[in-house]
Amino acid sequence: MAFFRDIKEDINVILEQDPAARTGLEILLCYPGIWALIWHKPAHWLYRHNMKMLARIISQLTRWFTGIEIHPGAVIGRRCFIDHGMAVVIGETAEVGDDVTIYQGVTLGGTGKDTGKRHPTIGNRVVISSGAKVLGPFKVGNDVKIGAGAVVLKEIPDGCTVVGIPGTIVRRHGKPARELNQVDMPDPIAVELECLRRRV
């Protein structure tokens, strides 16, 4: 049965990726991310079969028990790993690919009150670090790394590393996106002097 196969795969991914995980039993008892994903499966099924209220109730109970909010309309791929999942939010029209790792405080959200597709589509083998926000109806490619605290507001091609606010591509396929030298770097003394000048 696919449900149990998926759970076994999710447990194996955690055992492979998290050095703190010792056994499958420990994961089932102590990892809220696995429970959020387990309960998302029936909630998503109910949502797709037009039993939206029951799906939302399951989703809210799961949020209350785990601190992870996955809308039952969201599509989650296989072997997703939500590590330290507190305050993860995944919106209704979000799509998450296979082998994605999501850390605490991540939001896959919208940017307003638009209807229709309003949340991101995340590719395969993506790592979304702590506190990152991916906001809007665009695609994040395969093999992308999103740095902690980044705010991503536009499409990201395959193989990129994104950091900062707003999210800026700093690496493409393991190589710097552009070479920086001293001329490109801000002068910290000049920056501080400008701040002082503005105060006066």
Language model segments and positions:
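Terminal amphipathic alpha-helical/low-complexity segments used for targeting or macromolecular assembly
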Residues: 1-62, 66, 177-200
